[in-house]
Amino acid sequence: MVSQTSSDIETQKNKEKCQKLLNLSSKIRYVGIINEFGRTLAGQLRRGVIPLFKVEEARNEFFIEATRNHLRRTFEDSIGKIEFTLTANEKVTILTLPGATASSLYYFTFDKGTTFNEVLGIAEVVKRLIIEDN
């Protein structure tokens, strides 16, 4: 009998969270949870979606987003806590939301045609789910 370590259990929980979040909308291309160093804790790509990033590009993107998130947190005393960040690109829209602790970040990509209101609605649902899960 093989016992699971707490790390294995946490990884499985993160994978389940990603799948649950991916199921919120057919316009979500990818959901990932990354740590404060940009390392992927779990991620799920919508079925049939071709990734736009190469593996190395994804690693770099997640590192950049984790770094940006860390830097933004230094201003929370002045401007308040981060609710989410939104980046509109030619091919996708990227949404990031801080996790329940400073050590995680939720990373979403959306199909290009997704409206701001749709993304905002999903962001509100995700914020509630993050609170409920912790």
Placement of each model-derived feature along the sequence:
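Non-catalytic interaction/Regulatory regions outside core domains
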Residues: M1-N134
